[in-house]
Each structure stands twice: as C-alpha cells, then as structure tokens.
Amino acid sequence: YLSLEDVLSIAKAGDANGCYEALFTLGDKPEIKWNAAKDELNKFGFNSTHQYLIHCMKEVNESMTIFPHVNPGLMSKDEINDLKIHSPSGGIMIESFSKDIYSKGKPHYKTTTKFVDLRLETLNNALEIKYPMTTGLLLGLTETKEELINDIEQMVNVSKNNSSIQEIILQNFRAKVNTLMRNNAEITNDLFLRIIATIRIFVPGHISVQVPPNLSPDINLFLKSGINDLGGISPLTIDWVNPDHLWPNLEKLSIEVLKSNQVLKKRLPIYPGFIQKEWLNEIMFEKINNIIDTNGYPKE
C-alpha cells in the first residue's frame, strides 16, 4: 500500500498541475489472502483495505479540488455507499463474458473475483445506489470469434439495462514479457476498429466509448471509428496498470484529435450527463458545480 503521506503527495501534485482525477486502483481485498497486506493495514491502524481506502479518499477529497475515482474490485452496496461520500464515480471491468477463460491454462484460471456474475452484481449494486460507473472489455483474452461476438452482444445488453454505466472502455490486450501470456497474439487494428464501431452503434448514445491512447499507437485511426474519450493521461506518473506503455504527448494528441473533427478537453471523473443530485451526495454535487461550466466541464 501507499502510505497516506504518499497518497496526499501524489494527489497534491496532480491538483497543482490541473488534474481533476486521482485514480485509486488496487487489488481486490488482498488482506484476505496475504498476511503481508493484513499486517500493513494493521500498522496503519485499519482492519481492511476498504477502510483504508475510504480514509485516503476522504483526506484527498476534503483538502483538494481533485476528485477520487476508484477501481477497488468487487463492491457491495454498503461499500458503494461509503465510496459515494468521497468520490463521484467508480469502475469495474467485465473484461470478458467467456466461461472458457476460467479453464486451466487460460487467463482467469483460479481467479475468484473476476467471475462475470460477481462483476455484474457490482454494477447492479451501483445502479441501486446511483453511483456512476465505468466498465469495459479486455480484447484479446478470448480465442474464438464466437466468444468475441458474445462479448460485444452481452456488453451492449448490459449497457442498455444498467443506467449507472457512463463509460465503456475497450482495452486491447498487450503481451508482457515474463508472463504466461507473453506469446499470445494481440488484436489487429482492423478487428479492433470494427469492434469499436459496432459498440458505438449499439450502446446507448449517452455512454462514452474509450480506448486507452498509450496502448494503441495508431490512435488517429481509432479517433475516426467511434470513440469520444481517451481516459486519464497523467502529467506526473506512469500508467501503473500498464507501466511498459508511455503516455502520448498531449500536444501531438490534440492535433490528431482536431484532425478527426473533435476537440481534446479536460473532464471530470463523472460525465456531464450524470452531474445530477440523484447521482451525487449533496456535498459532492456542490463541489462539482463550483468548478464546472454550463456544459459540465471544468472551467478554463
């Protein structure tokens, strides 16, 4: 775990650099399996990752303009209620609806928290609590076209039946050295573009479609295929989820976005259409409205 001092140091630097999102991304309750995690939590004075997460989020949210956005894995209704006090939004990736990826030798073998039903339950909990969520697919985990088509179809269905979803990330698998999947094939640009276009056509229009720009070197192609978001790009830190892939240069990226007849601009972790009292607690609603323009974006 980062210490609270480190959390605040990073968040303050982001706040000073005009960032609006402090991403809290972490393992799913590691203290259940790892004694080292439990011991460190105890050293900090907490019994669970969730308790420590809430404490860190509270400190950031109450002392800065920057907003926590959380990816803590599976979330119960009670946990989401806690998170909603200090953050405007959260996220959980579905990754794939395939059952085969849980087989021996496959990406999710022996996992217990990546089961689709459990992740869908988290999204349903968010809907009941009214907590805006990001979700998405990890493209390249499955091996057959039938599985891929099912992933797309199921994601469309989920997006139509769960109004808490504000954004769908389409993330392409990138092989990493020293991992069991280091020799696995990566998705081709042509297929990736077709998937993006299909998702954009069939998911509700208010849902943003994102492709991480540091995982897709030909981002100019993807800008024309239906995406309208590039996710968080940090001026301070590496991409800790994909540390081998550097962030793009913002000036060059802005030029590519303009070529696609769009404009690159900052946003909050919560999209403008969700900045409503039913989706936010009163204090968060007020904090957000103090810094946004009439379109729901940060004032320049």
Give the role of each language-model region.
Residues 1-161:
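Conserved Radical SAM active-site core
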Residues 8, 62-64, 149-300:
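Auxiliary Fe-S-binding modules of radical SAM enzymes
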